[in-house]
Amino acid sequence: MGSVASCLEGVLDMIQGRLGNALARLQAAFPAQASGSAEKILAGRPSLEITLSIALYETDALDEVEQLLGEVLPHAKESSPPDSLISAHVLLARVALLKGDRDAWLRLLADLEQIGQQAGSARVICSAWLERARAATLENRLESARQALRYAELHADWERPGILLHGNDVDTPSITRFRLHIAQGDCQDTERDLRQAMAEANARQHHRRELKLRLLHALALNALERSEEAFEALSEALRFASHEGFMRTFLDEGPRLGSLLQRWAVLHQAQSRALGIEPRFLTTLLQRFVGHGEAPTPGQAPGAVGEGLTTREIQVIRLLAAGHRNKVIAEKMFLSEFTVKSHLRNINAKLGAQGRTEAVAIARARGLLD
């Protein structure tokens, strides 16, 4: 029964936004379940591993998640409750899509939908369609997203105020609808509804959900050209997430949030510690947005692929960040001043910067100066 208790406590930790506690609790319980095949299946191990996978996924430990869920999914199909089945299939599908395996993504969601149909579970069926709608929205396939959301809403009577089902903590019909409305530019009412949803989540201590809603709220404010309010919302989200390690909550919102985060970083990254934001978390998050292809270079439209800086251009921007003028940079790199100026023009064009100071700020936000 120890693994069942650890699993339930880990679920509560996740709902309340205590990712660090959840990881520590679940990882401590996991080795105790590593022996005894009967206990693995009968004493809650599939649910324990799936709950641990949710926590690991939030830290962007995708390989560990893939390994854990790949091992446990056959047992989960036989013995796990709907929340575990939903989480296992959706997380594995997302990891597959992130790694470029769209066929596996399609297959896992089809499997989940079939399980829901066989079990007569509207929520399981709905969850498969919610994930399809989420992916289509992020890929800017908005008509496909609308259609997937319509199918999800046919099975959405389980979403009620005050009821939280942990397999759908941050993936509900309303959250999916908010995301789609923002992508469509329908943000006036959405911004108001997000404020109300955040207040309700906060009152119930559903802080993981509140974090997701806050990021969507920042995107809605940004779309309404209320940039300062959007940056304030993002600062608050980063302040909370950086001390718990919530990484994928940000990354899963794709290029639109990545672009907003990089604009925020140009203005505020240097003051991150004073804002109560853990600098190492912020640097890692910015790098992973770029590394996963989930953030455009500043100055480009979301979804565009930026041209990377060459090794020589990175040397130039680092010397510039160190405070050196063109003449000194030329001497240190054995170049002419004309060549240095040419490199700086290329750097500004690639980073979407208007001048030297902004180029350095953007390079720092992208982790190029580390």
Describe the function of each predicted region.
Residues 2-18, 43-61, 84-100, 124-141, ...:
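Tandem amphipathic alpha-helical repeat scaffolds
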Residues 173, 189-216, 296-302:
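Generic long, charged, amphipathic alpha-helical segments
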Residues 261, 266-307, 311-312:
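Intrinsically disordered or compositionally simple regulatory linkers and C-terminal tails
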